[in-house]
Amino acid sequence: MITNIGYFQFLPEFLKVRKNLDVIKSLIKKNNNEIKKLDLVIFPEYFLSGPLKFDLIKDYEKEISSNEILISLKEISKISSKTTFVMGSFLLKQGGKYSNTSVVVKNGEVLTQYSKKALIYNENYICESNNKVAVFTIGKTKVGLAICWDLILPEVFRKYAKKIDLVVIPSFWGIGGNALQAKYSFSLEKKYYTALGIARAYENSFALLFVNSVGKYKSSFYSDRMMGGSYFVNPPLGIIHKTNNKDPNTLHIVKFDLNPLNQYREYYATDKDYFYYKTKKVI
């Protein structure tokens, strides 16, 4: 069984939520002939504003409300009504509290949402989270969500073992002032998040798609180079798709074949082994 997936390495303009929404809407309309053939389309983390500091939250709220964002995303999803959209992630206010949340929308309906667990930098002063995972289906394919730095927490991905076929990870991963990078000719960050994704996929017996923003990003309080390097890993085949494309507005397409993954599950059974050793109380 094949699931047809697309993604954009979209680079937002800092704190210009309405403008970014307009650009995203235009991208979907421009690529609608291709998107109509896709089952799933993903945008990166913070795709509407970029990361914020606590003292910028008032400006964010003046720009647009969380309810208005949700209404806009629902409307955008109707452009291709048969496609499911993972709407990156954004700061979502619910019950008076913010979280870094990814919302899954299809034809104007929210299917599920997921809040980032591994909060980092200014997120610790703005966001709250929970221990809930999110699962939705595309045909017979079950899909889960994680966000960016969650990759460092194996525990998050263990919750999906035997429950999903694919985990999607919207990300906003840059070079981040890595002082160690100057000592090496290759990208440490790309090696880091690629190795983590491969490990999470193989140890839990599911495929993994990492979708990262790309390009030079600038806000009022920091600048960064978003690394791109989005990739798709499908055990036992390994990485079957990776891009070095630097255009944030390019639609990338991946085909997810479930058959190799089912073969991996049958012969390696790393997901079943986890639960076996857990009952033995050795972990």
Where are these regions (language model features)?
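Extreme N-terminal starter segment of soluble prokaryotic enzymes
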Residues: M1-Y7
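Short polar catalytic/cofactor-binding loops
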Residues: Q9-L15
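Short, acidic/polar
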Residues: N20-K30, L153-R158
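Cys-nucleophile CN-hydrolase/nitrilase-fold catalytic domain and related Cys-dependent amidase chemistry
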Residues: K25-N107, G174-A199, E203
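Conserved residues at the C-terminal ends of beta-strands
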Residues: P44, G88, K117, P170, ...
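Active-site catalytic loop in hydrolytic enzyme cores
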Residues: I64, K93-A195, I253, D257-K272, ...
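CN hydrolase (nitrilase-like) catalytic-core segments centered on the catalytic cysteine
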Residues: E68-T84, I152-N249
